[in-house]
Amino acid sequence: MAAVIRIRAMAAGTRLRVLNCGLGTTIRSLCSQPVSVNERIENKRHAALLGGGQRRIDAQHKRGKLTARERISLLLDPGSFLESDMFVEHRCADFGMAAEKNKFPGDSVVTGRGRINGRLVYVFSQDFTVFGGSLSGAHAQKICKIMDQAITVGAPVIGLNDSGGARIQEGVESLAGYADIFLRNVTASGVIPQISLIMGPCAGGAVYSPALTDFTFMVKDTSYLFITGPEFVKSVTNEDVTQEQLGGAKTHTTVSGVAHRAFDNDVDALCNLREFLNFLPLSNQDPASIRECHDPSDRLVPELDTVVPLESSKAYNMLDIIHAVIDEREFFEIMPNYAKNIVIGFARMNGRTVGIVGNQPNVASGCLDINSSVKGARFVRFCDAFSIPLITFVDVPGFLPGTAQEYGGIIRHGAKLLYAFAEATVPKITVITRKAYGGAYDVMSSKHLLGDTNYAWPTAEIAVMGAKGAVEIIFKGHEDVEAAQAEYVEKFANPFPAAVRGFVDDIIQPSSTRARICCDLEVLASKKVHRPWRKHANVPL
């Protein structure tokens, strides 16, 4: 019996040693595997950080441009960037694209989230060092993913565009990727702020995403936006045109109105973008942040009492009024070099973000025309979508006459600005500084378009038209034209006819304008408006 027990014990010991031997081999195998995976992870990360390689990075720098990652690093708060999809690679196997040398971790775009002055934003930065920043299916997928996340959590999306366009090797998949992005641009419109910063070429299908975003900024001399390049234009129309002439920053900020501002270089653009974001809310559900204000809300501005010339035909600069009224003269003007007869931009009043709209008497006497109407309308609609109060300074003699305007559709385009002000439900405060003539008076956030508070300065002239034109109609053939003009001015070219009818709420001293506006904004902060249900409005596009 004892012998049997010893034999069984020996057998059990043998089996145990065998099991231990097998387990040891397994453990050693498992221990060595993570080392291999970790090495691969680190290698992939290193490759992703290099983008298209040092040679292409150097070429990017020689052009005066930062790399995709350098741009993100400068834009966001230090250490706040959390990258997503670093290991994503393109899926194209045609034209030799499956070769290992044509695979780059992250493909041609860097995506993720971070913070600007402590506030959450999502960002994508196209990497020109990888296939010229061209858009592949994987590239589009990465952008769409962060856009979906931004909509879900309610945070702005910033696109740093530097791309040669669609990746030709991927064919229709690349085009599908563009459409996926366009759809999200439309879905996000009015929900979260969308900002495009063009920092290199942006051609073909790539241009439509920036066009769908709320604001488009460009970098001088290095960024271009066009549907087709100069070579194609030459082949079709026989026009000789350079990239800069066709789609450079100057063209789009002064002629086409496609871009809202242009900056000197990448660093200047990114620093200004950080400043700009401070004015905006994170989403349509989030009020714009209120900054601590050291500029007294009841501050009087004596120089405003003499800023408007006594002669109604003499020009002055509306920016002088705007700068004097807002907090600490800090005004971020939008489209300053396009349609200069109207001024738009963001400022603060007692720490609150406001949208400013003002006619500019220095340019075309402040008349409204096609371009200024479109410029103003889009800005007003953005402010309304994101609950930013509107302050309007009015000095408008009417709509610009002439065949060029009529043939160009001034009636339809002018209606856009009228529509935008009428549709807006945010607090609306209007100050008539001098002329408010004809239909343009109605359009510029008048009481009839449900302006909340409408003020007139003593210099205000609210009438159907100017005295000279009115007299030629009313007193046609009258012997004493000067006396007739004086009579018209006495009766109509002053603020009293509108004031006695309640079309302006008060005639105020210009020096008290800041104090009155700040007080009104405090009261109107709780404004609520309920409109009839509709699927969407039919804007006169």
Swiss-Prot record:
* Coiled-coil residue spans: none
Extent of the transit peptide? 1-28
Q: Where is this region: Acyl-CoA binding?
A: 327-360
Q: Which GO terms describe its molecular function?
A: ATP binding; propionyl-CoA carboxylase activity
Q: Where is the CoA carboxyltransferase C-terminal domain?
A: 296-535
Pathway recorded for this protein: Metabolic intermediate metabolism; propanoyl-CoA degradation; succinyl-CoA from propanoyl-CoA: step 1/3
Q: Which GO terms describe its biological process?
A: amino acid catabolic process; fatty acid catabolic process
Q: Where in the cell is it found?
A: Mitochondrion matrix
Q: Does the record's keyword annotation contain Transit peptide?
A: yes
Residue ranges of the region described as Carboxyltransferase: 34-535
Query: Which residues are modified to N6-succinyllysine?
Result: 101, 250, 476, 491
The EC number(s) attached to this protein equal: 6.4.1.3
Position of the signal peptide: none
Catalysed reaction, written as an equation = propanoyl-CoA + hydrogencarbonate + ATP = (S)-methylmalonyl-CoA + ADP + phosphate + H(+); butanoyl-CoA + hydrogencarbonate + ATP = (2S)-ethylmalonyl-CoA + ADP + phosphate + H(+)
Q: Which residues carry this modification: N6-acetyllysine?
A: 101, 476, 491
Q: Main role?
A: This is one of the 2 subunits of the biotin-dependent propionyl-CoA carboxylase (PCC), a mitochondrial enzyme involved in the catabolism of odd chain fatty acids, branched-chain amino acids isoleucine, threonine, methionine, and valine and other metabolites. Propionyl-CoA carboxylase catalyzes the carboxylation of propionyl-CoA/propanoyl-CoA to D-methylmalonyl-CoA/(S)-methylmalonyl-CoA.
Q: What is known of its domains?
A: The beta subunit contains the carboxyl transferase (CT) domain.
Which family is this sequence assigned to? Belongs to the AccD/PCCB family.
Q: Which protein, by its recorded name, is this?
A: Propionyl-CoA carboxylase beta chain, mitochondrial
Which organism was this protein described from?
Rattus norvegicus
Could you tell me the gene encoding this protein?
Pccb
